[in-house]
A protein has these predicted regions:
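Short histidine-centered loop motifs in beta-beta connectors
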Residues: 45-54, 58
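Acidic low-complexity segments
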Residues: 82, 87-137, 142, 153, ...
Length: 383
């Protein structure tokens, strides 16, 4: 199978074997969570609850401030026990709401989704995405509704999902694609509806064969919604496309190298377009989103669920029992590390994200946020 890519790049050891085959497990329901108001690029949310308030899972606890901002929501049900400034894994103190669990884990009652999301107006979909607090989950944390609102003079033709996951150690995206490919593809379809485009792409590095197979099967069903008439083949993967198909999704196996997941490199590898220096993806007609973001969009639009949890890879040579965990936003790093057997004696540094672009943590009493794809414990050899 030929693989798409770009000129240059580096080839760090991927070091994913410890978790690449481990199914996602649910982390324990935390006894308390710390929900930062600044989990995204742009203006932090403003707390709208006070100490003593009772909240439900999915209830809004922070309101967006301005156009480049999103709300934040309770990830557990319980009582607000503090509102103030707390350490963030981004390296600074940030306003946050602390919730103590009541053990019931009850959803807020006013959450509702729609089965008919492909017939919804793009503006209505953007509003749902914003109200759900969805941001880029690959680490950039840019508000998704803003990224899906390009200027009218920018003609968007392609929606691209980033499933490269080129950072060493991390496997949260690959496990999502392998275990929940329908969520990813349905999310992509919603993105395509918002952007009013007919061509979608999913770029996945070729060392993730399980993810490629699972997502390719779901991508084929996009065409299967209409009557099949023709076949075509790309990179060794067969697709059925009906004559006059209104929407198609193509899975593109990518070369394994870094930074394959960078937007400009990904667009070159999937769509074949070069984004010139000083220009943005929208200037060549493309919008890129992470696969986890796409899945979050689907769950928000279909089921009314705001972004209150995500998959986190807890791994590295400094972790005794690496795992892929489905984690509530606001769960403290030290709790997750404890659920993975704790740190080894050789652990020297803990990083949020991967070793290439991650943020070293001076302390572990910091919460998982929307952009936390991994918690990696490194030894002195890696640092």
């Amino acid at each position: 199978m030929s693989k798409a890519g770009f000129r240059g790049g580096v080839h760090p050891p991927d070091r994913k074997k410890a978790t690449e085959s481990l199914p996602v497990a649910d982390a324990r329901l935390p006894e308390r969570v710390v929900i930062p108001m600044a989990q995204h690029i742009g203006a932090p949310a403003q707390p709208i609850v006070k100490v003593g308030d009772l909240v439900k899972k999915g209830q809004k606890v922070g309101e967006a401030q301005g156009p480049v901002s999103v709300p934040v929501h309770a990830s557990i049900s319980g009582k607000v026990i503090a509102v103030g400034s707390f350490p963030s894994p981004m390296g600074f103190d940030a306003p946050a709401v602390v919730i103590e669990s009541d053990g019931a884990d009850e959803w807020a009652e006013d959450l509702a989704g729609s089965e008919d999301y492909m017939s919804m107006n793009p503006d209505a979909l953007r509003a749902i995405i914003k109200e759900a607090g969805i941001v880029g989950m690959g680490g950039a944390t840019f508000p998704t509704h803003v990224k899906l609102s390009p200027p009218k003079e920018k003609k968007i033709k392609y929606a691209v999902l980033n499933g490269a996951e080129c950072e060493p150690y991390l496997t949260s995206d690959s496990r999502l694609m392998e275990e929940s490919p329908a969520d990813v593809i349905e999310g992509l379809k919603i993105i395509m509806n918002v952007l009013q485009v007919t061509e979608g792409f999913v770029g996945i590095e070729s060392n993730k064969q399980g993810a490629i197979r699972a997502v390719s099967e779901e991508a084929g069903k996009v065409a299967c919604e209409l009557v099949m008439e023709t076949y075509y083949e790309r990179d060794g993967l067969e697709f059925e496309v009906p004559k006059g198909c209104k929407m198609s999704v193509k899975v593109v196996p990518l070369e394994v190298k870094y930074p394959q997941g960078s937007e400009k490199q990904l667009i070159k590898a999937t769509v074949g377009l070069e984004v010139p220096p000083g220009y943005l993806p929208m200037d060549v007609g493309a919008v890129v989103q992470n696969v986890s973001t796409a899945a979050a969009i689907y769950n928000a639009v279909r089921y009314g669920r705001p972004l209150i949890e995500r998959i986190v890879t807890v791994t590295g040579p400094g972790i005794r029992k690496p795992k892929n965990l489905r984690v509530r936003i606001g769960t403290l790093f030290d709790e997750l590390i404890e659920q993975c057997g704790g740190l080894t004696d050789a652990a020297a540094k803990v990083v949020m994200g991967g070793p290439m672009m991650g943020i070293a943590q001076p302390a572990l009493m910091v919460p998982v946020i929307k952009g936390t794809s991994g918690i990696v414990a490194l030894t002195g050899k890696e640092t």
